[in-house]
A protein has these predicted regions:
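Bacterial N-terminal signal peptides
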Residues: 2-13
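Solvent-exposed loop/turn segments at secondary-structure junctions
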Residues: 41, 49-53, 80-83, 115-119, ...
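Hydrophobic faces of well-ordered beta-strands that scaffold small-molecule active sites
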Residues: 44-46, 74-76, 109-112, 183-187
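Aromatic-lined substrate-binding rim segments of carbohydrate-active enzymes
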Residues: 58-133
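Active-site region of glycoside hydrolase catalytic domains
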Residues: 104-107, 117-199
């Protein structure tokens, strides 16, 4: 089981008006507490390896294993290249399958968005981003060395990432806005550059 600390974002307050019972953080004395369907909810979570959730077939035995561990929530990565394989064309079959798998096993989900960065690298961006460094520029270190990491200074990059993330959030709200299988979304994962501090 994984204890996790970090910047997490509740999914549905980002999108227009609140839905009844949606996951939310409430101040309880001096602490913040997660509430789901109006009741306190303690996450007992198991976090998957980076790409484990990229295959529904691979996930089949994992759901049962999480139940055996008495977990109530699975932390699973969603990578941009599988969500938007072609610019502006989204494939949410994996997202839907993960939500369905969690529901079938009485589990909740916390998704981790592997967008522009994952562990200081840009490994999970779509091919249409990887193959166009003119439009989606890369980091240049102070010694002049170039890295295959998207620069945070590239407007086209962050706009494309934001558009994909917004489409994903809208889809999750459409398919899960009433059932609250998805509790939270981590926005990006370890953004930055390995072995240097900035572009």
């Amino acid at each position: 089981l994984v204890v996790f600390v970090g910047a997490i974002l509740l999914t549905f307050p980002l999108l227009a008006e609140a839905l009844p019972g949606q996951p939310e953080l409430k101040k309880q004395g001096t602490a913040q507490q997660l509430f789901v369907d109006g009741k306190p909810f303690l996450i007992i979570g198991g976090e998957l390896h980076n790409s484990s959730s990229s295959s529904l077939a691979y996930m089949e035995p994992i759901w049962k294993h999480m139940q055996e561990l008495n977990a109530n929530t699975v932390l699973a990565g969603l990578n941009w290249e599988l969500i938007e394989p072609q610019e502006g064309h989204f494939d949410f079959a994996l997202v839907d399958g993960l939500i369905q798998g969690a529901r079938e096993h009485d589990l909740h989900l916390v998704f981790l968005w592997f967008g522009s960065w994952k562990n200081g690298m840009s490994s999970y961006v779509p091919l249409w981003v990887k193959s166009n460094p003119q439009r989606f520029p890369r980091v240049v270190l102070k010694n002049g060395e170039k890295r295959e990491v998207l620069t945070p200074l590239g407007e086209a990059s962050w706009k494309a990432d934001a558009a994909a993330f917004a489409a994903l959030m809208r889809h999750i709200r459409e398919v899960d806005g009433k059932q609250h299988t998805v509790l939270m979304m981590q926005v990006e994962n370890e953004p930055g550059i390995l072995n240097d501090s900035r572009d």
